[in-house]
Structure formats: C-alpha cells, structure tokens
From Swiss-Prot:
The keyword Transferase does not apply. The gene is TMEM108. The keyword Lyase does not apply. Transmembrane protein required for proper cognitive functions. Involved in the development of dentate gyrus (DG) neuron circuitry, is necessary for AMPA receptors surface expression and proper excitatory postsynaptic currents of DG granule neurons. Regulates the organization and stability of the microtubule network of sensory neurons to allow axonal transport. Through the interaction with DST, mediates the docking of the dynein/dynactin motor complex to vesicle cargos for retrograde axonal transport. In hippocampal neurons, required for BDNF-dependent dendrite outgrowth. InterPro entries: TMEM108. GO terms for cellular component: axon; axon cytoplasm; dendrite; early endosome; endosome membrane; postsynaptic density; somatodendritic compartment. The chain crosses the membrane at residues 7-27, 477-497. Residues 31-176 are annotated as: Interacts with SH3GL2. PANTHER family: TRANSMEMBRANE PROTEIN 108 (PTHR28673:SF1). It comes from Bos taurus. Interacts with DST (isoform 1). Interacts with SH3GL2. Interacts (via N-terminus) with CYFIP1 and CYFIP2; the interactions associate TMEM108 with the WAVE1 complex. It is found in: Membrane; Postsynaptic density; Endosome membrane; Cell projection, Axon. Residues 498-583 are annotated as: Interaction with CYFIP2. This is Transmembrane protein 108.
C-alpha cells in the first residue's frame, strides 16, 4: 500500500513539473523580443522643447528631442529617414544603390531603420542624441548632409560662467558601433582634409566670421543647438527681446560647448571629449541616465567633416570656435543650401527667432501632455493636425543680413501642438505637428508611415506589427501529449489497483484446507457408527478365559474380535476372525 502511494505521488509530481515546464515554454515563446519592446523616455524633468527643421527638397535630416521634450520629426521629401528607438549604433542605408558613407558616433547610439516615402524619424531616447541622415534620391554619396547635435545642461542655468579646466575634462566612452580616431583630450575637433577647393574657402570663411563675434554674451539657459551644412545665418533668442541680436554660429564668448565632435572621413568618425567639467560623463558602456549631460552625440554623412558643437550648462562664456569649421566635400552646399544653427531656450516663454532652413522653438514650461494626434507628412509636405499656415522656405541664396531681418520680422502663429507658444515665422516652414513626434513608444522596425501617434495614449504606443508565433513541430506536440497523458493514465491505473486491494472478499471456510479436513472427518463419523463386537461373551466364558490374556503380547488382534477404529483414515478396519488388520 505504501509503495503504491509513493508511486502515485511520484507520478503526480512528474505531471505537475511537466505542466509547469510546458507553460514556461509557451510563455517564453509568447513574450515579445527585445526589438519589439517599447522604449519609454523620461518626461517631466524639464519643460518640453520641440525643435523642427524644414529642409530643402534634396536633403534629409533627423531631429532630436531633449530627454524630457517631445520628439520632433523632420518632414523628409520622398526618401527614407532614420528612426532612433533602441540603444544601438547602425548606419542609415542609402537610396539608389549608394554605398554607405556615413558613420554614427553616439553615446546613446541610434538605431536607423529605412522606411518608405513620407516616413519620418523620431528620437525618443532618454539621452541627448542625434540620428544620421540618409541620402535622398538625387543626392551624391559624398555630398554633405545635415548634422544635428543636442546637449542637455546638467546644472541650473543661473550659474555664473566659469572657465573649465582641462584637467576636469573627461573623455566620453566610445560608442559600440563606431570606429573613431579620437582627438585626444583637446576640446577642439580634428577636421579632415577638405575634399575640394570650395571646402577650404568655406573653412576660412567660417573662421573669419567666428572671429567677428567675440565679446558677445549668450543668454544663460538650457540651450539646444542644432546646425547642419553651411552656416549662412543664425538665430539666438535674447532674454529681454524677441528678436535675435546677431548670428549665432561663430560665437567665441558663448557658453562652452558640452560636446565638440567632428567626422573626418566617410567611414570613420572623430570624437572629441566634452569641454564642460560641470557634469562629467561616467565611463559606462550603457549611459542610461540622461542627467549626466555629457552624452551629446552627432552623426554626419561620410566624406564631409561636419564639426558639431552643443552648448550644455553654461560653464563659461567662451565657446570653442568649432562651429567655424565648415563642412567640406560638396562645392554646391555653400551656394545652394542655406543652413544654420538652431538655438532653443526652453526656460523662457517668448516667441523664438528663426533662420533659413532651421526652426528655433522656445516653448517654455509647456504642459507634459500634448493633446494632439499628429499625422505623418506625405511626399515631403509637412502637415500639422491643425494645418498651421506654412510659410515658404527661406531662399537658399539669402545672406546673413536678410536672414536677420527676416528673423526680426517673424510673425507668431501658434499651433496647437506647441500650446500656442511656438510662432510660425515667415522665413521657415513651421509644421511642428508633422509626424508622430509625440509618440515616444514606437518600437524599432514597427513604424509605418501614415499612422498617427495619439498623445493621450503615450504608454501604449504603436502596437508591434510582428506578433510572436509558436511553431511546434510534430515531436513537440507528441511530447506535450505524452507529458499530459502518461501521468494521468498511470495515476488512474494506480488508483484502480489500490481500490481493488482495499475491497477484500469475505472469508469463505471452503477456501481453507483445515475446513475440508474437519468436514471430511466429521461427515465420516456421522455416517458410520463404530461397530461393536460381534458376539458377547458370557461371564462363564470370560471367566473361563481369565487365564488367557485379553490382548496379545505382540499386538496381534486377529483372533480377539476387536475393532480398531482410526478416525483419520479413510477406511475402518474391522478385525474379524477372517480379517487381518495391519496398521
């Protein structure tokens, strides 16, 4: 009985273990992969800031957002853009069979995913980052592409400027997917040799202009700078007025850039350590905290040494003259494309100034939730949910003076996505609602152009298009069936045996051997009586035979006439005169 119970318990345990393993396998197969996991960027740390840059018809750019700001996409004309949602470094594939010539150098690396026409890029990364721009259809691989840089200040903006010491400058860790030739501990990037004669001229022009703006003071605050291509104009919102004072790039007295980086070759990326000692970057491979502030990244197209600089915490009033280094490689960029810096100061609630090709948004303490559903631009036409009036792009041949005038004459036309704080200037296309810039939970590889991002459901994001399916082979199915059926059958058999053993039959005397022996004996003696002696001797005869022994000495009862009864024998031997009994 004990053995049967032990066997039953063992079978039950094996059955339970098998079920548990099967469920674990099923759940593991149903869990989404890391690529489908949603990336949530922190919010609420600083006032939301939105930056939108309008591009020409042959240029692509990727917009970035602050750690707590709204993701700002850039309308791309008929071409794929990059989408950064996962911490990984990849290069953007090119159209028309162009070999990849750009390299990404990021701290929070960006994952670039090609999309169809009208797609846009979002940057929902917790750290300041920039994504690469992909070539358009009619673009040569060696042509310069916009470079975007974003830096989050690490301390309060009201801190008095102090000159950073070189000893406190720390080198940011190398991104996993970028091969770089570091510029050492120097706060100045190493530009590559210009590929053409126009590149040298552009570089000299940038240096000359950078030296003309010495002594200018930049407003303190959290400033996010984005510049791409050539520098033809600049924007800088003033704390006291709504119009910029003078061109922004080339300031030598502006706050020290937090990260100075440049690309020097089509297949390599130069990285320069940050020059701001306020928030040193920890040499961690992940750098998951956006509060460290030293994680500004940049990307640039190959074949052009784009020098990027972003101002983080205003550590000093001196800016490294990195922006003066103009990108080289495309002689037509200096004349056909008008690019400039972008300065966003979220600490103030005044309308921003704008420049050609760049939109500077000063959003101020914008609410955390933007109640607007944004649609994706189709065929490069930025569309907002409110269809805000879009001013024509500033002509590419405009000079700095015209840009400055256009900036001063900018007319504010608020859009619902910016809570009525962002104007629509005359010199740039203001479509801050273009694309799904508020949807920060778009998994990599699952973004579809044309799907609108609902801001009220930020926690949900777009549902993954690829659902996990369980593929079970015949052997797997057989094992599952066996794992379920065998324990049940064995348990049923054991229970049946136990029940049969417990049901004992009533005791039957006929089954015992002793019963039969006793029965035979009693039955025989009941049927057969003991036969008495045949003749009764008289006393005379007995007295006459007194001298004779009653029993023979040798046990011979042949002539005595006595009957020997053996109750355990099958036959009774009657001793008579003519019968001899031998026991």
């Amino acid at each position: 009985m004990k053995r049967s119970l032990q066997a039953l318990y063992c079978q039950l345990l094996s059955f339970l273990l098998t079920l548990a393993l099967t469920e674990a396998l099923v759940f593991a197969a149903q869990e989404p992969s890391p690529r489908e996991s949603l990336q949530v960027s922190p919010s609420g740390t600083i006032p939301g800031t939105m930056v939108t840059a309008s591009l020409s018809s042959t240029r692509h750019s990727s917009m970035v957002a602050t750690p707590a700001s709204v993701v700002t996409p850039t309308p791309h004309p008929d071409g794929p853009s990059s989408q950064a949602t996962a911490p990984m470094a990849t290069t953007t594939p090119h159209l028309d069979g162009h070999p990849p010539t750009n390299t990404i150098s990021t701290i929070m690396a960006t994952a670039s995913t090609p999309h169809s026409e009208g797609s846009l890029s979002t940057g929902p990364l917790p750290a300041a980052m920039a994504t690469t721009s992909s070539h358009s259809e009619g673009r040569a691989p060696g042509e310069t592409a916009p470079t975007i840089l974003l830096t989050k200040p690490g301390e309060a903006t009201s801190r008095p400027p102090t000159a950073p010491s070189r000893a406190t400058i720390r080198r940011p860790p190398r991104p996993p997917g970028s091969s770089r030739k570091g510029a050492g501990s120097s706060p100045r990037p190493i530009p590559a040799a210009p590929s053409g004669h126009a590149g040298r001229k552009d570089g000299q022009r940038g240096r000359n202009q950078s030296s003309t703006h010495l002594g200018q003071k930049r407003p303190l605050g959290k400033i996010f700078q984005i510049y791409k291509g050539n520098f033809t104009g600049s924007v800088e919102p003033d704390p006291s007025t709504f119009t910029p004072r003078n061109p922004l790039w080339g300031y030598s007295s502006s706050p020290q850039p937090q990260t100075v980086a440049a690309t020097s070759a089509p297949s390599r990326t130069s990285w320069v350590p940050p020059t701001t000692p306020l928030v040193p970057v920890e040499d961690k491979p992940s750098l998951s905290r956006a509060d460290q502030g030293g994680g500004s990244t940049f990307t640039s197209q190959g074949g052009e040494p784009d020098a990027t600089a972003a101002s983080g915490t205003p550590a000093s009033q001196q800016r490294a003259p990195v922006p003066s280094q103009r990108p080289h490689g495309d002689p037509q960029d200096g004349s056909s494309h008008s690019d400039s810096w972008l300065t966003v100061t979220p600490g103030t609630s005044r309308p921003p100034s704008t420049n050609s090709g760049v939109f500077a948004a000063t959003t101020g303490p914008i609410q955390a939730a933007f109640d607007a559903s944004v649609s994706v631009p189709s065929e490069g036409l930025p569309q907002g949910t409110s269809l805000a009036p879009q001013a024509p792009a500033h002509p590419t041949w405009a000079s700095e003076s015209t840009v400055s005038q256009a900036e001063e004459k900018a007319v504010a036309t608020p859009t619902p996505t910016m809570m009525g704080r962002v104007p629509s200037p005359l010199s740039t296309v203001v479509s801050t609602a273009t694309g799904n810039f508020l949807n920060r939970l778009v998994p990599a590889g699952t973004w579809k152009p044309g799907t609108a991002g609902n801001i009220s459901h930020v926690a949900e994001g777009d549902k993954p298009q690829q659902r996990a399916t369980i593929c079970l082979s015949k052997m797997d199915i057989a094992w599952v069936i066996l794992a379920i059926s065998v324990p049940i059958s064995s348990c049923s058999v054991l229970l049946t045996v136990c029940c049969l053993r417990r049901k004992k039959k009533p005791a039957n005397p006929e089954n015992s051997l002793s019963y039969w022996n006793n029965a035979i004996t009693m039955d025989y003696f009941s049927k057969h009586a003991v036969e008495l002696p045949r003749e009764i001797q008289s006393l005379e005869t007995s007295e006459d035979q007194l001298s004779e022994p009653r029993s023979p000495a040798n046990g011979d009862y042949r002539d005595t006439g006595m009957v020997l009864v053996n109750p355990f024998c099958q036959e009774t031997l009657f001793v008579g005169n003519d019968q001899v009994s031998e026991i």
